[in-house]
Every structure is written in structure tokens, then in C-alpha cells.
Amino acid sequence: MLLSKYFLPVLKEDPSEAQITSHKLMLRSGMIRQQAAGIYSWLPLGLKVLKNIENIVRSNMDKAGCLEVLMPCIQPAHLWVESGRFDNYGKEMLKFQDRHDNTLLFGPTNEDMVTDIFRNNIKSYKDLPKNLYHIQWKFRDEIRPRFGVMRGREFLMKDAYSFDIDEESAVKTYNQMYKAYINTFRDLGVFAVPVIADNGPIGGKLSHEFHIIAETGESNIYYDKRFKTLKDNPDIDIEEIKSWYAAAEEKHDASKLSSDKEITSSKGIEVGHIFYIGTKYSVNMNALINDEHGKLTPIEMSSYGIGISRLVAAIIEANSDAKGIIWPIAVAPFKISLINLNIHDSKCLELAERVYNELLAQNIEVLYDDTDVRAGSKFATHDLIGSPYQIIIGPKKAANNIVELKNRKNGEIEDIDLNKRALNSYLTFFNS
């Protein structure tokens, strides 16, 4: 992509309405623009990140055996009345009447609707287990939306719902999804810790929250240091992982810890929540299944959520510095920023075009800065938008077929002599 053709409305200063790092940087880097309180348009750069995260989440749900569906964001209120949850969300749930005086709502979650789909289509234990998921926009009319997409009114969620014949099978599915979440956050390139949590208005018997560790987090998390090994050792047994200590501050009890436990504490941002619900919805909504003895029994359900739009902000909170965003490679909108410092220099132009075409041939997402602005402005822009790597082409080194490869995270710069080695031999980090 040529920067001269791209839509990237960057801001030089922090917007006055932004309080936290991610909100400031998402506005400054041209990722989003506010349309109303807590409601945002996603511009090209932001949408690329959102889609990258969505695709990684989708891939891990598919690997876990989940089946993708798409439920509407507008739901009939009678399902929520039937489940007994219609009044639970209060004014946060946006309700309205259609022209036929039917009460509808903009769904904040989908347990009620997915239970309705299940009960009308699956009747036998032979069709179990089932695990359905969708990725859809939600709306909650927060009284004080703030912090950009971190706590907006409209947000993108992945919700999965599993259906099992009995508690043993339900717990097995829950554990599979717990592991799938660990794999998901590893693939996103972030460090997330699962902690025991309350079920809240969703209801149920068992629950875990997943928190990205970030200095600017809103929750205090206490956890076993062994969680830090998950990124490099994803095959650890699920029961071993669940035996490691992890708790949010309200559930932390130091007196119950043995002296040999290595516990650390950090700030965390909740980005995922999984629930073993049990039969709450199946009983209320008459979602029954014929078991192997022909007896009607309420289905065992679990629910699994990941805040995809919230993840964008949380990743920035955990991966940024004074200059801007530092994207993990997996979610970066562009893996490389190609910066031509002098578009009027024939050698710079020739080398930039050559490198650009080589990167495209390798299917590496690259933003080629072909604009006619001063070098300092270019560096500021590309540090702000956070491409993990920058290839910098300036007249002095270009004359000798040398370009610079800069690591955005640590600032290290390496000369690439294109007379001696092919460009792709320097880009092995894309295959690691």
C-alpha cells in the first residue's frame, strides 16, 4: 500500500477528550473517529487491526471444533422475558418498539437467542455436543462511556455457546475452550492470565476471566510466575495450568498460599470471560434433550466471550511507548513501514520500488511511504502507527545499495547490504 493513496488522518497532539494511552493513540494514529458518545467509526488502519484479531480468534475457535453462525444484533424481547433476564440489564439494554408494537432490543449478549435456536433444532443426545459461535456487534447503553473503545457503548464480541448432555461432558468442553483461549492469546502475541471470577448476570457454576497484563490495567491480578511460560510452551496439560494460582484482588487470599509458590502481581485488563452456566437457560426456556434412556433432560450450557474491539485497545495499553504503538507482528496492520526519505533521489526511488515489490511478492503487508514530507515527520508517523519493523532508505546508504532495518520495539537498526544478501534472508522473523 502506498501511503500517498492511503487514508491515514494522523494527529500531532493528544486529543483533549482522551484520558488513557490507547484512546489517545487510536485517535492520533487515525484508527478511529468518534461519532457519538461511546460510538466510533473504524478507519482503514484500525479496521485492519480489528480484522486481524478477528481472524486469529476465528481460527482458534474453528480449531477447537466450534461452528460459526451469525445471529442478529436486534433481538425480540420475548426471549429475554422467557429466560428471566429482561430486567437484569436495566437501562444499559437499549429497547424499542417496531411499527407493530413488538418490543425489540439491541443485544448485549446472546444466551437467550442461541438457546432458542438450539431447542427448536436439536432434540437427541446423539446430536451432542455442539459448540456454536458468532462474531457480532453489541450495544450497551453505558451511563458514562469512556476510554475510547475500551469502554464504549458499541463493541465487537466473539461469543461461543456450548451444549452438552451432562455435567461431565460440559466440564470437558469448558476445559477445551479454556485451552483454546490460552492458544488464542498466545497467537495474538499477548500475555494473558486466566483468573477465577464471578458469573454475574450470565449465571452459572464456574467462571474464568482472561486479563492482559498491562501497567495501565484497571484490575490488580495475583498469579503464579509459571503463567509466563505459556507463550513458549503451549502444550502444558490443562489440569496443570488450572492448578496454578491466579486471582483478581477481590478473590486474592495470601493466607492460603504455601511459601513455595512464586506469586507476582500486576495490573490487568479483562478481555475475555468464560462461564459454565449449567441448566439456567435450558430450564427457563424448556431446552430439553432426549437422553440415551429416552428421558427429557435440560441441556448443560456454557458461554465464552472475547471482546475483539476491546482487545485492540488492551493490546495498545500493553504495547506502546512515548512515540506510539508497538504492534505484535500477528495483529499489526502493516508488518513493515518502508520509508523513502527522499523521493526526488533517483537511487532512493529505485531501491524503494525494488524493496516494495520484493515485499509484495512475499505477501508481506507493507506501507510504503512515498510522500514528499521531511524525514522527521515520516519517522514520527511510522513510530506512531507502530509497524513492528521499518525499512529506511536514505540517499547516502542507498548509493551503495544499503537500506536500514529498524526494530520498532527495541530501536535496534541493522544495515542490509543488498549487494551481498537477498532481502528475504533478513526477514526470517516472519517465519518464526
Curated annotation (Swiss-Prot):
Family: Belongs to the class-II aminoacyl-tRNA synthetase family. ProS type 2 subfamily.
GO biological process: prolyl-tRNA aminoacylation
EC number, as in UniProt: 6.1.1.15
Cellular component, GO annotation: cytosol
UniProt keyword terms in alphabetical order: Aminoacyl-tRNA synthetase, ATP-binding, Cytoplasm, Ligase, Nucleotide-binding, Protein biosynthesis
UniProt subunit comment: Homodimer.
Gene field: proS
Protein name: Proline--tRNA ligase
Compartment annotation: Cytoplasm
InterPro entries: aa-tRNA-synt_IIb, aa-tRNA-synth_II, aa-tRNA-synth_II/BPL/LPL, Anticodon-bd, Anticodon-bd_dom_sf, Pro-tRNA-ligase_IIa, Pro-tRNA-synth_IIa_bac-type, Pro-tRNA_synthetase
Family annotation (Pfam families): HGTP_anticodon, tRNA-synt_2b
Role this protein plays: Catalyzes the attachment of proline to tRNA(Pro) in a two-step reaction: proline is first activated by ATP to form Pro-AMP and then transferred to the acceptor end of tRNA(Pro).
Transmembrane segments: none
UniProt organism field: Rickettsia bellii (strain OSU 85-389)
Gene Ontology MF, one: proline-tRNA ligase activity
